[in-house]
Amino acid sequence: MTKGTIMQIAQPYLLFLGDVTDPLAAKTARGIYQWRPEICLGQIRLTPETVSLGLTDMTLQQAQQQGAKTLVLGTANPGGVIPEAWQATLLEAAEMGFEIASGMHQRLAEFAPLADLEQRGLTKLYDVRHYDVPLKVGNGKARAGKRVLTVGTDCSVGKMYSALAIEHTLKRKNCRAEFKATGQTGILIAGSGISIDAVVADFISGAVEAISPDFTDHDWDIIEGQGSLFNPSFAGVSLGLLHGAQADALVLCHEIGRPHIRNLPHASLPTIEQTIEANLAAARLTNPKAQLVGICLNTSAISEEDAAQLCQDWSDKYQEPVTDPVRFGVDAVADKILTI
């Protein structure tokens, strides 16, 4: 299940969509298919009304014949509980030798028949939202390789999307880049990683050092950021990430039009200047040469024309590439990274 301390999920995948009918409930599966279509062999739906990703519908038997290794629960529901209606399919998959990966709050191992099959060596269960493997504390020692970390003015401002877009664009430019996941969906996309918000606080920076250790076999690690130094709920996670990432380059993410810190109407958003200054100061504890290389915006609240003008205005103001990754791509940010 692990390589050292890092979860390693076998590929390719069969994406399990269960019986969900809300497209938003399948956003994890959709993200996997968007960013790693080559590892998604098909989908399995329990009812005709279940949302579809447009993948081939397969039975467990068909997927196994095609070479699928892991059944991935690509959905979410209120409370994160695995419904009883799903359990027969999960049990059949485990009995057939599929590994099973889930980002749900409820652990797969809480379903006793699945836990028994894992203990007997017939399956492997990956609860990517949880992490129980011992870790070392961070040490801040210089590591081989170059690293990008996405940071933000708040949580849920596009740090994972931006990191994946940067990885994709760097690869297109013949740069050997690897996405390093620190959250549940990112782990399922990458097939490996550590869910940082499941790590005991003392070990957060050490976990990031484990996710992105010394490397010389590729050019850049693109590390998925979490939270924000300015979000009172999650700033501790963000600080540990900054220290452990030892990033050479930071990419700042922000949502245009957000009125306040998410779910905290009493907490004001920081200015862009404050966010840049605080993140660089924290990053430079473990990499004194850390620098900002771009700003990625979620401009969905305004028109595309206004967004293009805003990106140009901000680029002039901050003297860095500024873009909306969804609307305009991240070529300019990638080009700046390649100058380091």
Where are these regions (language model features)?
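Structural motif
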Residues: 16, 72-74, 149, 220-224, ...
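Extreme N-terminal, non-catalytic leader segments
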Residues: 79-80, 89-147
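Flexible, glycine/proline-enriched loop segments at strand-loop-helix junctions
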Residues: 100-105, 149-157, 194-199
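ATP-dependent carboxylate-amine ligase catalytic core
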Residues: 2-46, 53-68, 169-246, 259-267, ...
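Short, hinge-like loop/turn segments at secondary-structure boundaries
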Residues: 58-59, 112-123, 142-145, 194-199, ...
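Conserved catalytic-core segment of NTP-binding enzymes
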Residues: 102, 106-108, 126-130, 205-213, ...
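Walker A (P-loop) phosphate-binding motif
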Residues: 133-177
